């Protein structure tokens, strides 16, 4: 590690390159005051304490933060660790710097308080303290400053007791790494996650690092050859660019390995190349050359230029398939690259003006300009709301845990997270003292949730559908697979037991399949999936499986209509009486959105209802098929709002910023762009744009098109 003298030289040299004389004078003032106030303090490593705020401030300089935030970085431990007060800092520097230092101190103190809770293992929910500490109009730079502080602390954590290391590492991984990702600071997120992972699980850290290194050695020649090919193609087309290589982070790779059964070759973005070029047009030119010259895995293609992420990240991602190796290519401009590395921090560009005004990133920096309140801020950061619930379990009488969770959690997510060892034995859940009928329930604020566990394994495959957490779902799948392999789990056995309680036996597999054929159902698993979500009053679903039941065929009609009713109920269409369907498929061939003028229709084929627009080309010359008019279910659209795919063609007069304006207007209007195919004729100044986008309904689509007309763009449009 560098000495404090080396870091001081580096820091002073970098601020000299970036700032005006007046700004340098302010930063130097903070530098020397912080050094003086921390003069007699030491870290556990024996180093001068000042090395920590100095490294924190150096990170802020490298992340392009403004002088106010850099000064606060130098002073961020002053209130906590010296006798200086907020008033003193405000008097010597400014009120703005003093408030920043106070805000960061608040977060630090709340974090420490959470760590010292008596039941910290149960109660340490790391999102909650931010919700408490940032309780009034705060800005993104507070969190950026805190990220710089935490990055240095986690990088030098080895001098703390092991248990304290683990608590801080857990906090860093679950909160700070996530915040860094949400505001677009991906390199910082990777560093925080990897350093935390090393503390929390050194064995898996080393194992994952070893696998990555083996891949690097094994594919070294293939990797180098590909880069040379790429450089040659770009040189032949006279494209200016910078090429950067990266290997996926250790923790991120570990998480992917858990999904891909420890097979590292299945990770498509382990190796990546960044191509940084001058303009958006060059980005798409490079994309075309790559797709023309290499084999592409299309399922990983993402156009974040046309449809930026909420944290402003923009780039085109495409994956090249080489011999035994996948390489992700990221194509972006220099400005996009700055955002990808520093996220919203990249927008604290300090203008060289006499008055020294900060220049936040115009309308783009909506997290600062629009989301001032901490509740909204956290909702943006975590992509969901944070709610408080109370949980208890039958095996822990008189123990109630108060925890904070994302609002998109379901009951089984909570059960698995808090009681993983007992999860498979879950038999009953009560909410506020009342037993619920279905485990497929989301959590709500202030709920009291009581979990009841039995002695025997009660795990069911349908529970997977009742969970939102993909990691937990994957673990349940693996548990079911193990049980099935050992012969200790079978859903048929569950229904056989229910029949036994009625003094009936299960029919043979051959007989059951014969009966399923009458329902046009091929697999027993499909039948079980259907009856799981169907309410029967007279046990028709069980009697249908019973041995020596001559009346089973009389049950087919009520079963068919019951199944059809459930399928329609779970769709966005009104029920059509008198038909039997097992599935509704909204086909991707044409635009079908609520409220559109054209009739939506369904083609019934082998009990599957395929949904098309009346004018769809796939319906032409198919009069022999059974075509059924469909009607949107207004109530379902209100209860379960979602976006629907629409294909739009836009053509008109082209200019350099036309396509970008169109895409930005759609995004700002809450449309989601999935794919964009532009054709530009510069000689005629014309463009033709095919866009696949998702909207709520036809009215939203019309509104988006109207908004585009306000951007001084001459165009016409139609849906396909």
UniProtKB/Swiss-Prot annotation:
Its EC number is 3.1.7.2. Pathway: Purine metabolism; ppGpp biosynthesis; ppGpp from GDP: step 1/1. GO terms for biological process: guanosine tetraphosphate biosynthetic process. Keywords: Hydrolase, Manganese. GO terms for molecular function: guanosine-3',5'-bis(diphosphate) 3'-diphosphatase activity. It comes from the Bacteria. PROSITE patterns: HD (PS51831). InterPro entries: HD/PDEase_dom, HD_domain, NT_sf, RelA/Spo_fam, RelA_SpoT. It is an enzyme of class 3 (hydrolase). Its cofactor is Mn(2+). Residues 49-154 form the HD domain. It catalyses: guanosine 3',5'-bis(diphosphate) + H2O = GDP + diphosphate + H(+). In eubacteria ppGpp (guanosine 3'-diphosphate 5'-diphosphate) is a mediator of the stringent response that coordinates a variety of cellular activities in response to changes in nutritional abundance. This enzyme catalyzes the degradation of ppGpp into GDP. It may also be capable of catalyzing the synthesis of ppGpp. Belongs to the RelA/SpoT family. This is Probable guanosine-3',5'-bis(diphosphate) 3'-pyrophosphohydrolase. The gene is spoT.
